[in-house]
Swiss-Prot record:
A Pfam family assignment: Lipocalin
Protein's cellular compartments: Cytoplasm
Protein name per UniProt: Fatty acid-binding protein, liver
GO cellular component: cytoplasm
Notes on the domains: Forms a beta-barrel structure that accommodates hydrophobic ligands in its interior.
Domain of life assignment: Eukaryota
Keyword Nucleotide-binding: no
Major subcellular location class: cytoplasm
Key words of the record: Cytoplasm, Lipid-binding, Transport
Keyword Cytoplasm: yes
Matching InterPro entries: Calycin, Fatty_acid-bd, ILBP, Lipocln_cytosolic_FA-bd_dom
Function: FABPs are thought to play a role in the intracellular transport of long-chain fatty acids and their acyl-CoA esters.
Alphabetized GO MF terms: lipid binding
Length: 114
C-alpha cells in the first residue's frame, strides 16, 4: 500500500475514476536488462504495458493513464530512477527492490508518495 498515492495521482492530473482504479490495482513489475538496454513490463487486472529503453536516453512513453511523456531512466545506486516530463510538468519515480517486493517513491513538486 502506498501512502499519499491519491494525492500524487491528483497532482499529475489523473481524474477521479482513474484514481479509483489506480488505488486498487496491484501491478506485477518485471525488469530485465542486457547492458544499458532495459525492458520493463507491468501486468495487472487493469492494463498490461511494456517499455523498452536505453538507460540515460529520453524516449516517448504513453503511460497507463494515457499521458504522453518524455521519459528517461537512470540507475542511482540500487535504484532505477525514472523522470517523466509532459505539458510543463515533471515527476520522478524511484524504484528499489527489497526482498521479493519493490518499493517505489513517486514525487511531483512537494507531493511525495512512498
Amino acid at each position: 500500500d502506498s501512502a499519499n498515492f491519491d494525492e500524487y495521482m491528483k497532482a499529475i492530473g489523473i481524474g477521479f475514476a482513474m484514481r479509483q482504479i489506480g488505488s486498487v490495482t496491484k501491478p506485477t513489475l518485471i525488469i530485465s536488462a542486457e547492458g544499458d538496454h532495459v525492458t520493463l513490463k507491468t501486468t495487472s487486472t487493469f492494463k498490461n504495458m511494456e517499455w523498452n529503453f536505453t538507460l540515460g536516453e529520453e524516449f516517448d512513453e504513453t503511460t497507463a493513464d494515457e499521458r504522453k511523456t518524455k521519459s528517461t531512466f537512470t540507475v542511482d545506486g540500487d535504484k532505477l530512477v525514472q523522470v517523466q516530463r509532459w505539458e510543463g510538468k515533471e515527476t520522478t519515480i524511484s524504484r528499489a527492490v527489497s526482498g521479493d517486493s519493490m518499493v517505489a517513491t513517486c514525487s511531483i513538486g512537494d507531493v511525495v508518495c512512498a
